[in-house]
Structure formats: C-alpha cells, structure tokens
C-alpha cells in the first residue's frame, strides 16, 4: 500500500499497517490493525483492535484494546467509517463508527457511539461512557465547565435521535433519552426504566427513577436549591410542568 509514517513513531510487536494509512508521531503496538485511509496523529494505539475506513485518531488520544472482560470475549475494539477521536481514551471493546465525533471523552467496556453522534468534553471535564451504553442518531452529550459537570452514561443507557445531555447527568439502568429532549444537570440521575422523549426538558437537581415516562412538551425544572424526586410508575406528558417534588399520589 501507500502507508506513510512521519515524525518519530514507534511501531512494534505484530502491528499491521496498510493501504493509505498515515501514522504521524504515534505509538502503535501489540497486534493493532490499521488500514484503508486512517490517520493516527500524536496518539497511541495498543493491543488487538481494528481501525479502518476514514477514521481519525488525533491529539494525544489513547486507544487500549482489551478483550475478555465481558460475555463477548472475542469482540475487538473497532473504530471505522468516518469516526473521529480527539483528546480521548478509548478502552476495552468499544465500537466507534458512522460520523461519530468524540472529543475529551473516556469510553470503555462495550460502549458504542455511531451515526452523527457528538461527544464533547473539554479540558476540565471528560464525558464518560461505559458498560453497554450507546449514543447515536444526531444525539449530543456535552460536558460543562463547572466542577463535576461530567455526563456519565452507564449500563444499558441510550441517547438517540436529536437528544441533548449536558453537564452533571448520570444515566443508569434502562434509560432512553430521545426525540428532541434536553437534559441539563444538575446533578441529574436517571435510573431504572426511564424514557424521556418528544420536546421534554429536564433541568436542575433532579432524581427520576423506576418506570417514569416523560414526553410531549413536558418540563421538569428544579430552581435554585430545590431538588425534585420523581419515582414511578408515572407518565408525564403534554404541557405538564413540574417544579417541585409531587406529593405522594398527586401525579
């Protein structure tokens, strides 16, 4: 192929590089496979993984493939299509593809980011995505600049369609945020069968758990030092607007 290797690079231990790959000031080792039109610049790629298509790994990113920690022992870390990774750590068996753009993130285990998803941390706060969490569609997950403004997606949580997650938000078991919903922390904790979709808006210091569905143009907003706790089963929709914890049985 026409692979190019420029600036000081370290390549060792069963690395495969071919096609039109460009490796610039990077360390690649231990079984990594890099092909097609990939660019790896000022970053490291270690262990058995596959980076191909038009993927780019840039700006002090660290790719560390580790298999065998999950039920899918054989699944390898892959970055492909037009996925771009900047200033991020990608570990274990992660899958990044489509037009995903990832900046200042820590993504691990079997998490997936794909389609046109945007993951955007900053130099103060990374976005953290782990377990089997997925971000896809045109969804955006964005860290804030204040302390702890770190979005965290865990377990089987999913952010999809045109949803926005911003700031100190933690999504746990069986959480799906989709539609044009906006969730701005915080801190916000969503856990145990929570669905947020439509044009719903969740903002402030809020705990939503146990089978709660929020859709339509509903808003749950905690002002100042208030904390709102919603525990299901509950359906909140239409133009509903909640600004304090409902009395038991009132919803």
Enumerate the predicted regions with their spans:
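Residues at the loop-to-beta-strand transition
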Residues: 3, 9, 15, 21, ...
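Extracellular/surface-exposed low-complexity segments
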Residues: 250-251
């Amino acid at each position: 192929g026409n692979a190019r290797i420029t600036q000081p690079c370290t390549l060792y231990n069963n690395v495969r590089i071919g096609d039109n790959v460009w490796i610039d000031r990077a360390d690649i080792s231990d079984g990594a496979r890099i092909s097609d039109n990939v660019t790896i610049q000022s970053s490291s790629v270690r262990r058995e993984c596959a980076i191909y298509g038009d993927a780019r790994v840039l700006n002090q990113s660290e790719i560390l493939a580790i298999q065998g920690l999950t039920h899918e022992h054989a699944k390898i870390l892959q970055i492909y299509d037009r996925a771009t990774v900047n200033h991020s750590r990608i570990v274990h068996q992660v899958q990044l593809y489509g037009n995903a753009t990832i900046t200042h993130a820590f993504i691990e285990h079997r998490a997936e980011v794909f389609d046109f998803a945007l993951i955007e941390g900053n130099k103060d706060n990374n976005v953290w995505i782990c377990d089997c969490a997925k971000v896809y569609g045109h969804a955006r997950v964005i860290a804030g600049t204040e302390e702890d403004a770190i979005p965290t997606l865990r377990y089987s949580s999913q952010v999809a369609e045109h949803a926005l997650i911003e700031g100190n938000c933690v999504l746990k078991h069986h959480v799906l945020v989709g539609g044009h919903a906006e969730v701005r922390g915080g801190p916000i904790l969503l856990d145990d069968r929570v669905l947020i979709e439509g044009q719903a808006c969740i903002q402030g210091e809020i705990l939503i758990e146990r089978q709660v569905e929020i859709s339509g143009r509903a808003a749950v907003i905690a002002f100042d030092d208030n904390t709102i706790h919603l525990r299901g089963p509950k359906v909140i929709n239409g133009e509903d607007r909640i600004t304090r914890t409902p009395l038991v049985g009132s919803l």
